[in-house]
From Swiss-Prot:
NCBIfam families: PRK04180.1, pyridoxal 5'-phosphate synthase lyase subunit PdxS. It is an enzyme of class 4 (lyase). One of its GO terms (biological process) is pyridoxal phosphate biosynthetic process. Belongs to the PdxS/SNZ family. The active site is at residue 82. GO terms for molecular function: amine-lyase activity; pyridoxal 5'-phosphate synthase (glutamine hydrolysing) activity. Pfam families: SOR_SNZ. D-ribose 5-phosphate binds at residues 25, 154, 215, 236-237. Keywords: Lyase, Pyridoxal phosphate, Schiff base. CDD domains: pdxS (cd04727). It comes from Listeria monocytogenes serovar 1/2a (strain ATCC BAA-679 / EGD-e). Catalyzes the formation of pyridoxal 5'-phosphate from ribose 5-phosphate (RBP), glyceraldehyde 3-phosphate (G3P) and ammonia. The ammonia is provided by the PdxT subunit. Can also use ribulose 5-phosphate and dihydroxyacetone phosphate as substrates, resulting from enzyme-catalyzed isomerization of RBP and G3P, respectively. This is Pyridoxal 5'-phosphate synthase subunit PdxS. Its EC number is 4.3.3.6.
Length: 295
């Protein structure tokens, strides 16, 4: 029996439909409804938001399928869910459940410290994190239909997401300016598939959307990432760790859409209550850096 898999064109097209929007982490149906009402283009169903995963320690795994099912029943927008890096069975279970996207996520404890999933082997589209063009193109080479910056999840600190977005976009400009005879060396240096390096040279951009994620905690953070070239924004702990989640969620969505309307962003930021406290990066131990969990 021939195995059914989705084509890159279809998967990437589905991801393109989320462009310009906000995707919010939720842990129950009530939060999912708040996200949908605020204007989120999709939700990420998980058992704990990244800040709680970070605080709890231990091994973080795929969410209880009951949570994912409850979220899927509660909203009409697409539902994503996270699987551990390299965990084929978690990903197959989520695919069988009918989720719209799977995030092969460094927020969860990796199941395989050497190999990522062969995402082209699945029908469902995948989202993956990246810090630079090498990671981005390796994930696309495996079949990812959508990328996001890794940032540093659960910190409420935007600095790493900014670093990763600037790094990827700077390296795209570098490749776009190369002559054809320099591309093979670029593929070697970046550890990236040659055909995808050539595609970057031709397009002048990634062949898939690249969202900002990891540390978005305020409307201004979301707008900043759009200014830097993000195709949209993931918000993890920032919304439901704030004092007023519904108001905060709506403000993030509007700031993402109207990211150059600074007067509006100022108004949206008024009287939101306190955002999540956040963590200064220098206070993180090297072993606690989630962004270093994949390669």
């Amino acid at each position: 029996m021939e195995k059914k898999v989705g084509t890159d064109r279809v998967k990437r097209g589905m991801a393109q439909m989320q462009k310009g929007g906000v995707i919010m982490d939720v842990v129950n149906a009530e939060q999912a409804k708040i996200a949908e009402e605020a204007g989120a283009v999709a939700v990420m169903a998980l058992e704990r938001v990244p800040s709680d995963i970070r605080a709890a320690g231990g091994v973080a795994r795929m969410a209880d399928p009951r949570i994912v099912e409850e979220v899927m029943k509660a909203v009409s927008i697409p539902v994503m869910a996270k699987a551990r890096i390299g965990h084929i069975t978690e990903a197959r279970v989520l695919e069988a459940m009918g989720v719209d996207y799977i995030d092969e996520s460094e927020v969860l404890t990796p199941a395989d410290d050497e190999f990522h999933l062969l995402k082209s082997d699945f029908t469902v589209p995948f989202v993956c994190g990246c810090r630079d063009i090498g990671e981005a193109l390796r994930r696309i080479g495996e079949g990812a239909a959508m990328l996001r910056t890794k940032g540093e999840p659960g910190t409420g600190n935007i600095v790493e997401a900014v670093r990763h977005m600037r790094q990827v976009n700077g390296q795209i400009r570098q490749i776009a300016g190369m002559t054809d005879d320099e591309l093979m060396v670029a593929a070697k240096n970046f550890g990236a598939p040659y055909e995808l390096i050539k595609e970057i040279k031709t397009l002048g951009k990634l062949p898939v959307v690249n969202f900002a994620a990891g540390g978005v905690a305020t409307p201004a953070d979301a707008a900043l990432m759009m200014e830097l070239g993000a195709d949209g924004v993931f918000v993890g702990s920032g919304i439901f760790k704030s004092d007023n989640p519904a108001k905060f969620a709506s403000a993030i969505v509007q700031a993402t859409t109207y990211y150059t309307d600074y007067e509006l962003i100022g108004k949206l930021s008024k009287e939101l209550g306190s955002p999540m406290k956040g963590i200064e990066m220098s206070r993180l131990n090297p072993e606690d850096r989630m962004q270093d969990r994949s390669f």
